């Protein structure tokens, strides 16, 4: 069931939901291509010659500097044309407080604060599948009736606000947020009525007050990949437009923050050659990055019942050697709505079937050809499983590892509680720890020039659900 708060703000949230869900013009802050930059994305009803943001070091916006970007045709919502505004601002210094304003429909909006952190010692919040609207059909605590899609979006967006506020109150050191995808639940596709519902969900997702000050780096999930809304809302840095099999939502991208290189893969694209090219390009352009972190939606090494032995691993035996060859340290995943972390894994160096015939015309939101074959042919399923034993467990130590070999994979559970899956019955040998608490969780990752540490917490109580895992590189 969807959790609700006992506090009075729940009543206020319900009363204001119709305004919240139709507020399509909310601003998303996104990390820039490096620490000194910050990207902005927002919808507007009016077309402008250029999008404009201004930055100052005071809330009165005296001596503010203007930055200009693009304003292009975006999403049509309920018959109304909206425009997608994108701006990049630069010149940000460490440990400094700034204020920003965006110009919306010809008027400057309220100024909001943005604080930079320390690029040599920073933290980010890592969340799994907020998937606003996914609790549809569930029976909430205060009713005996199954939730409609609209009520589900309302409740999930409320819980999303709660998770973010709780995390930031307990961990004020958080500098930005990373989501491996599925910000919303409704795929929509070409259905205008469903697309309206999808935009309600995006409004609920972006309504979080934390996002007025907190940049977010989000991947494309399978529920995000069928419309242009993702790329219209989020102004991602270094989009990999050379991707040959991209989805309409957009592309993979990459950015640096301090000593870390983040490579965000659009794993709904089943062409591994595209992902290889993106990883190699990002690494080549940032050869001195101490940490190399991949973010992707599908969990090629997870432990959820729904995906970790089926469509979720269709790219495993191709991506594993790519990550090895490019010295990736960590892969942050979602998709399976369960918690799991692996041992240090490497490719076993062998050649495997890439199941190309099951990828033609298929993608992250449509993999019926593979699903049907796995369900109808037990011999094929056994073969499919055998061809995904493409890894070697390089190190089984726990706690703090020093200069370990291999890649660490993590799958995050739902940050909103909108949807959970069971764990797969037989725990895989690559899994070091896993759980399903049926409660929203989030992780906080701290990175210094020589140490990576991840801790995961219950969103309501703030208590750890697992021991810390750290990697030291010397």
Question: What is each PLM-predicted segment?
Answer:
Residues 66-79, 126-162, 187, 191-194, ...:
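Acidic/histidine-rich helix-loop elements
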Residues 86-89, 97-116, 139, 144-150, ...:
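Extended active-site neighborhood of metal-dependent phosphoesterases/phosphodiesterases
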Residues 126-128, 176-182, 216-222, 265-266, ...:
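Active-site neighborhood of phospho(di)ester-bond hydrolases with catalytic His/Asp-centered motifs
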Residues 132-136, 184-188, 220-228, 271-273, ...:
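Active-site environment of divalent metal-dependent phosphoester hydrolases
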Residues 200-208, 314-336, 439-440:
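Catalytic-core region of carbohydrate-active enzymes that cleave or remodel glycosidic bonds
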């Amino acid at each position: 069931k969807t959790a609700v708060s006992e506090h009075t703000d729940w009543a206020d949230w319900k009363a204001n939901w119709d305004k919240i869900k139709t507020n399509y013009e909310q601003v998303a802050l996104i990390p820039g291509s490096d620490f000194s930059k910050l990207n902005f994305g927002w919808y507007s009803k009016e077309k402008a010659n250029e999008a404009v943001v201004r930055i100052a070091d005071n809330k009165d916006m005296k001596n503010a500097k203007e930055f200009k970007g693009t304003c292009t045709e975006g999403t049509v919502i309920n018959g109304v044309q909206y425009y997608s505004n994108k701006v990049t601002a630069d010149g940000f210094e460490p440990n400094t407080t700034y204020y920003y304003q965006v110009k919306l429909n010809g008027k400057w909006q309220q100024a909001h604060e943005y604080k930079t952190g320390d690029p040599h010692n920073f933290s980010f919040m890592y969340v799994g599948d907020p998937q606003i609207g996914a609790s549809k059909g569930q029976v909430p605590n205060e009713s005996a009736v199954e939730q409609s899609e609209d009520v589900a979006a309302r409740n999930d967006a409320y819980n999303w606000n709660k998770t973010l506020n709780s995390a930031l109150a307990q961990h004020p050191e958080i500098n930005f947020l990373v989501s491996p995808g599925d910000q919303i639940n409704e795929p929509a596709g070409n259905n205008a009525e469903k697309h309206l519902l999808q935009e309600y969900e995006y409004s609920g997702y972006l309504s979080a007050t934390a996002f007025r000050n907190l940049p977010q780096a989000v991947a494309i999930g399978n529920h995000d990949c069928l419309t242009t809304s993702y790329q219209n809302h989020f102004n991602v840095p270094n989009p990999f437009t050379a991707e040959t099999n991209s989805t309409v939502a957009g592309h993979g991208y990459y950015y640096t923050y301090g000593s870390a290189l983040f490579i965000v893969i659009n794993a709904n694209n089943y062409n591994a050659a595209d992902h290889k090219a993106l990883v190699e390009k990002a690494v080549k352009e940032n050869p001195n990055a101490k940490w190399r972190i991949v973010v992707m939606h599908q969990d090629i090494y997870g432990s959820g019942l729904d995906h970790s032995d089926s469509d979720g691993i269709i790219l495993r035996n191709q991506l594993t050697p790519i990550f090895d060859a490019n010295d990736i340290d960590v892969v942050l995943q979602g998709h399976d709505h369960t918690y799991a972390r692996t041992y240090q894994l490497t490719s076993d160096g062998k050649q495997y079937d890439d199941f190309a015939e099951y990828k033609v015309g298929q993608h992250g939101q449509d993999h019926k050809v593979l699903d049907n074959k796995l369900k109808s042919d037990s011999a094929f399923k056994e073969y499919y499983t055998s061809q995904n034993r493409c890894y070697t467990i390089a190190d089984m130590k726990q706690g703090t590892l020093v200069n370990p070999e291999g890649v660490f994979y993590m799958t995050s559970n739902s940050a909103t509680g909108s949807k959970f899956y069971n764990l797969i019955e037989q725990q895989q040998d690559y899994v070091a720890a896993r759980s399903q608490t049926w409660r929203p969780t989030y992780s906080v990752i701290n990175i210094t020039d020589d140490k990576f540490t991840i801790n995961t917490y219950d969103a309501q109580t703030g208590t750890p659900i697992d021991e810390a895992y750290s990697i030291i590189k010397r």
